[in-house]
Regions:
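S-adenosylmethionine-dependent methyltransferases
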Residues: 1-362
Length: 362
């Protein structure tokens, strides 16, 4: 099923009335980002390995995002109740992952929100939709790095727009999606990409047979092989990284991407990633590591698009704090979107200034 929303709460809550009761779990002793506690090291995950661990079918719904031009983009998402069923069915049920399937939002040290779709990620989709350099035809490479991706709505939108461009008019496109929790990548991020591809090609005989009347997609070996074949033939790469933000994390970001030989655009995306001072510091360091690497690369341009609440009550992060940190590091920032109804939110663009202090052109 599909639905639109005009939300004013903290997150996009699509809890189905038919969901099973939430399991009782013991909170995990630690999770990113908590100062002084062990963090998961950064790790890359191959597409083939993650595909091999998918269930035989996934249930999904579509989120209808109303854009500023009056149109809408439909973004598929695996149902949370379907994720819960999979976790409960697995012998080594992941208590930490199940903790993320309740109705709460961020609980520092326990759950960081990866299974949910957040308001700011939708704000970021709206900003990207208004930028023809990423939605329309292009011959130069595009590199997308989404940090703290969760359900990866911004990357999913870019993926769908890339699929809609004729192959001769689409330059190489790479997506590196990263979440601290590898279970999030396995259970929601990758399934959402497969769903987006399948729905875009749903009229093919293979996929007509794979979609069920109950709102499910059967992930047969033929379907998964066709997904991989499409990526390879379309010059689209999809890579996954888990673990804490760190210099090693940035090294994996670049190791995961194909070599870029022509002028290219790199986008760093982050939605709801700066909700505490500790998270803000780690996120900002990674963003500037990437921006500095891109500035050193020939014929490359880069920008970070950061979407967040103006203030995270009780945990200490804020969008204004990110802007202050970015400007103190010599970046040029601009506000691309403001939301004042309900929880105040914004989207800012961050680029490194030129030697004369001006922002580089797109």
């Amino acid at each position: 099923m599909a639905f639109s929303f005009g939300f004013s709460g903290d997150d996009i809550d699509d809890v189905d009335a038919h969901e099973a009761p939430q399991p009782t779990t013991t909170p995990a002793p630690s999770a990113f980002p908590v100062p002084g506690k062990p963090q998961l090291p950064a790790a890359a995950h191959s597409l083939a390995d993650l595909l091999a661990r998918l269930p035989s079918k996934v249930a999904y719904s579509s989120l209808s995002v109303q854009l500023d031009d009056g149109t809408a983009v439909q973004l598929p998402r695996r149902e949370l109740w379907d994720v819960r069923v999979q976790l409960m069915a697995e012998e080594d049920g992941d208590a930490e992952a199940a903790e993320g399937l309740g109705k709460h939002d961020v609980k520092t040290g326990v759950y960081e929100g990866g299974f949910k779709s957040w308001e700011s990620s939708v704000d970021l989709v709206k900003v990207l939709a208004a930028d023809p350099s990423v939605t329309g035809p292009r011959t130069s490479p595009l590199s997308v790095m989404e940090l703290g991706c969760g359900t990866a709505l911004p990357s999913l939108a870019l993926f769908q727009w890339a699929m809609a461009i004729d192959a001769p008019d689409r330059g190489p496109t790479s997506f590196v999606v990263a979440d601290y929790n590898p279970t999030v990548l396995q259970l929601v991020t990758l399934p959402n990409f497969v769903l987006a591809w399948a729905l875009h090609h749903r009229h093919s005989p293979l996929l007509q047979e794979a979609f069920t009347l109950d709102g499910e997609l059967e992930l047969t070996p033929d379907v998964l092989q066709a997904f991989q074949a499409y990526l390879a033939s379309s010059k689209i790469s999809l890579s996954f990284i888990s673990g804490a933000w760190s210099p090693e994390f940035v090294q994996l970001l670049y190791a995961a991407q194909p070599a870029r030989t022509a002028s290219s655009l790199a986008l760093v995306l982050g939605a709801e990633t700066i909700y505490s001072p500790f998270a803000l510091q780690a996120f900002t360091e990674v963003v500037f590591d990437v921006l500095n690497r891109e500035r050193a690369a020939p014929e490359s341009s880069a920008a970070a698009l950061v979407a967040a609440k103006r203030l995270y009550f009780g945990v200490g992060g804020s969008l204004d704090d990110f802007v202050d940190k970015a400007q103190s590091k010599g970046a040029v920032t601009s506000t691309l979107r403001e939301e004042t109804e309900g929880v105040r939110r914004g989207v800012v663009r961050c680029v490194l200034g030129t030697s004369d202090g001006a922002a580089p052109a797109n």
